[in-house]
UniProtKB/Swiss-Prot annotation:
Keywords: ATP-binding, Cytoplasm, Ligase, Nucleotide-binding, Pantothenate biosynthesis. The keyword Lipoprotein does not apply. ATP binds at residues 30-37, 149-152, 178, 186-189. The gene is panC. Beta-alanine binds at Q61. It catalyses: (R)-pantoate + beta-alanine + ATP = (R)-pantothenate + AMP + diphosphate + H(+). This is Pantothenate synthetase. It is an enzyme of class 6 (ligase). SUPFAM superfamilies: Nucleotidylyl transferase. GO terms for molecular function: ATP binding; pantoate-beta-alanine ligase activity. Pathway: Cofactor biosynthesis; (R)-pantothenate biosynthesis; (R)-pantothenate from (R)-pantoate and beta-alanine: step 1/1. It comes from the Bacteria. The lineage of its organism: Bacteria, Pseudomonadati, Pseudomonadota, Gammaproteobacteria, Alteromonadales. GO terms for biological process: pantothenate biosynthetic process. It comes from Shewanella baltica (strain OS155 / ATCC BAA-1091). The keyword Nucleotidyltransferase does not apply.
Length: 281
């Protein structure tokens, strides 16, 4: 696998592939990779002739009092895992490469509406940071296809909306959440959990599963939400949000809506975990 921190190197290699009529898939990451990321890379390899990955801990998407400095950097292990999964080109830029004028002077991309609810309400500016860096990476790599995990459901919708609104010629593919045997969604932030917290953490998935089951049995949105919040608190979580939304727009769900998604974020110990469940009522 070729690794470079330089934009020109990435463009030169992609251009060489394009000259042969070959296709390119892209998997952007922040590193500290787990099996969910590796699944994205393997899926990417099945879609296109070549796979490009990136590792960049993006300062623009971290808010005040968030874990930018604490975010684990594991480049050697990540490189090995990416190579084994089929990536051929790895972009590892520094903040100076991506934001040469600094964050204050950087042009940014903001997707209105869906960026400001749920995680966007809890983490102001987060999705502006996500949209900006992903747009920049898309312009550098210029892939045919880009893959993202469905675990970050709101992020996936933000990126799909940005691509559609800006007429970017890229197919965005969401890939199913990879879970541990307990049901806990794989996440780099699971590393912050103590053994006791990790044992309690599957309650997050259990709560949203119970909500969906209740809705399908005719229980009200309010009823299933209150029951789920109580179960999370009993398990040791502090819920940030737990909401039922329209699956395509993230508008507040109405009884007549068929396509629904339950989204939650909750704190346990030092970790803020997210999960979701997409279903039809």
């Amino acid at each position: 696998m070729i690794t470079s921190a330089h934009i020109d190197d990435i463009r030169t290699q992609v251009r060489a592939w394009r000259a042969k009529g070959e296709t390119v898939a892209f998997v952007p990451t922040m590193g500290n990779l787990h099996q969910g990321h590796i699944t994205l890379v393997k899926e990417a390899a099945s879609k296109c002739d070549h796979v490009v990955a990136s590792i960049f801990v993006n300062p623009m998407q971290f808010g005040q009092n968030e874990d930018l400095d604490a975010y684990p950097r594991t480049l050697a292990a990540d490189s090995e895992a990416l190579t084994a999964a089929g990536a051929e080109l790895l972009f590892t830029p520094t903040p100076a490469v991506m934001y040469p004028k600094g964050l204050e002077q950087q042009t940014y991309v903001e997707v209105p509406g869906i960026s400001n609810v749920l995680c966007g309400a809890s983490r102001p500016g987060h999705f502006r940071g996500v949209a900006t860096i992903v747009c920049k990476l898309f312009n550098i790599v210029q892939p045919d296809v880009a893959l993202f995990g469905n675990k970050d459901y709101q992020q996936l919708l933000v990126i799909k909306t940005m691509v559609e609104d800006l007429s970017l010629p890229i197919e965005i593919i969401g890939v199913d959440t990879i879970r541990e045997d307990s049901g806990l969604a794989m996440s780099s932030r699971n590393g912050y959990l103590t053994a006791a917290e990790k044992a309690a953490a599957p309650a997050l998935k259990q709560a949203i599963d119970a909500m969906a089951a209740g809705i399908k049995q005719g229980e009200s949105f309010e009823q299933v939400t209150e029951q789920a919040k109580a179960s999370l608190i009993a398990a040791g979580f502090t819920p940030d949000y737990l909401e039922i939304r329209h699956a395509h727009t993230l508008e507040q769900a109405q009884n007549q809506h068929q396509a629904l998604v339950i989204l939650t974020a909750a704190y346990i110990g030092k970790a803020r975990l997210i999960d979701n469940l997409r279903f039809d009522s």
